[in-house]
Amino acid sequence: MSSSQNNNSSWIDWFLGIKGNQFLCRVPTDYVQDTFNQMGLEYFSEILDVILKPVIDSSSGLLYGDEKKWYGMIHARYIRSERGLIAMHRKYLRGDFGSCPNISCDRQNTLPVGLSAVWGKSTVKIHCPRCKSNFHPKSDTQLDGAMFGPSFPDIFFSMLPNLTSPLDDPRT
């Protein structure tokens, strides 16, 4: 990305535009600013200022390195909210997360899942609702699994149960 592009977009725009970050959805500014949603997260006001700044200027030296983690943890909370589930639902229906590599799943759309809610434990995986298996995504993503957490697919499908189609039972 050229420096002129960096200078004309917000940190969130810049971050979401990085190759490999396509699993993430945009967390609205009002959600990020709500102190209730920040509860329990370690952060510095400078990081929040960088994330919410309408224009990013990476040459100013105001990037601290913790923005990715902080945005990721807010993202994990947001995708469990009604608005977040709607945003992830759109991405799921478009197939943004990829499809199950298991042939018997017939290219079932998948969801991102973290194997841990603790930052730095593992990268994101994809979860198939048909075979209930987790796989490494085909996309070139190195997102931390904590940005989604281990319970996201369960929450998603409990709120939208008609989206799953179980594998055909060969005994019937």
From Swiss-Prot:
One Pfam short name: CK_II_beta
Any one Gene Ontology cellular component term annotated for this protein: nucleus
Family: Belongs to the casein kinase 2 subunit beta family.
Name of this chain's protein: Stellate protein CG33236/CG33240/CG33244/CG33245
InterPro entries: Casein_kin_II_reg-sub_N, Casein_kinase_II_beta-like, Casein_kinase_II_reg-sub
PROSITE patterns: CK2_BETA
Tissues where the protein occurs: Probably not expressed in wild-type flies. In males lacking the Y chromosome, it is testis-specific and constitutes the main component of star-shaped crystals.
